[in-house]
Amino acid sequence: MRAALWFLALFGVASAVALFAGDNQGTVTVFWPPWRVDLSLNLTLLLVLMAFGLLHVALRALSALFSLPRQARQWRLQQKERSLHAALLDALAQLLAGRFSRARKAAQAALAQERALAGLDARLPQAQQIRVLSHLLAAESSQALQDRAARDAHLQQALNESAERGVLVSPETREGVQLRAARWALDDRDAPAALARLEELPQGAQRRTLALRLRLKAARQDRRTREALETARLLAKHRAFSDAAAQSLVRGLATELLSGAHDPTQLLRAWDELESTEREMPEVAIHAAQRMVALRGDLALARAWLLPVWERMVEQPRSLNDSLRVKLVRALEAGLDSVDADWLARIESAQRDDPRDANLQYLAGMACVKRQLWGKAQQLLTHAGLALQDPLLHRRTWQALAQLAEARDDADQASAAWKRAAQLEAP
């Protein structure tokens, strides 16, 4: 279509020229004493056009001639710029391939090319960012080579370059350097330095998933359990882990926080710092109760912490595994001396509803021992002793049966029970 239009235009121009020049009788007379030259108007116009064309070509030729030095300089700068980018890409490729010495050399070559360009007064739009990335790649390679002196030198230069904020430099460049510095501090087992690097980040950058992961590792490494727990909660909200992994991580940190309490007041303060979902975790509640028992605190409060776990076990017997059921029984057994009537009713009701559960038989039997219900205690503990799997509970069962036999002055049964208890290894 375009060619057809060009042909039509060409035909139109040819027709116009033919109409204008075909019957044109005009002449142009040039007086140059003593000469006189008569030229037709058509020839005059043709000569003018030819002169204009020659002048235009001559000017273009002169312009091209005088621009040769500038074009040669631009060509040299382009070659150096290409070499710079090639060296930077080579450094990244060598780093990813695990060739750290070559990666560092390539990064240093990129820095040398950038300095050469700067010496030629070449202004690259991304010069500052290229310098920062080159230093960062060199520092990363030095870290892999265990050359901490070179790593720190390149890191400091990268920080200095990124601190000079220009219009064309993005803040993410400096944030990336700070995150890598925090990671290297973690690799050096220097958690305070890693946390200090993370604190230098802007507020928005501190809440990114990568920064939170680094903060979590640094806090755990530095034994800052509260900070680690808060960070783990944020990561769970950001879905940085799977639900199971997040729950396991939070559960472990909550348990560690409770373990750090050295008196009942500290334990209660740590318990209050936990969220409701964390308090409902069986492992956390049982561990809190065990710590309260170990610290000789309020056993009624410990039983109150265990109540949701107990109700869950009664309503859904399979919701707790055998290990948690044993821990729950141990925690409740430790407070049987001060247990109230409500808890005794709960224990008795749960044992009646599930008469084959050896753990419940043991707990109910020990409760009967504390209440001096010898006959019922003898019956429950005898059945429990035949089915218990936990070595400690099994051993305590036979010890209790031996004490009951001694109370009845039955020396033979007491001796047999003590013998069975001695045969069981303490955990």
Region locations from a protein language model:
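Transmembrane alpha-helices and immediately adjacent membrane-cytoplasm interface residues
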Residues: 44-75
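Membrane-proximal, non-transmembrane interface segments of integral membrane proteins
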Residues: 74-182, 188-193
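Residues that mark the junctions of alpha-helical repeat units in TPR/alpha-solenoid scaffolds
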Residues: 83, 124, 131, 174, ...
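Structural register within alpha-helical repeat arrays
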Residues: 90, 131, 138, 181, ...
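Residue at a conserved register position within TPR or TPR-like alpha-solenoid repeats
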Residues: 94, 135, 142-143, 185, ...
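Structural motif corresponding to the intra-repeat A-B loop/turn of tetratricopeptide repeats
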Residues: 97, 145-146, 188, 222, ...
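Alpha-helical repeat scaffolds
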Residues: 108, 149-161, 190-202, 225-238, ...
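Alpha-helical adaptor scaffolds
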Residues: 146, 174-183, 317-390
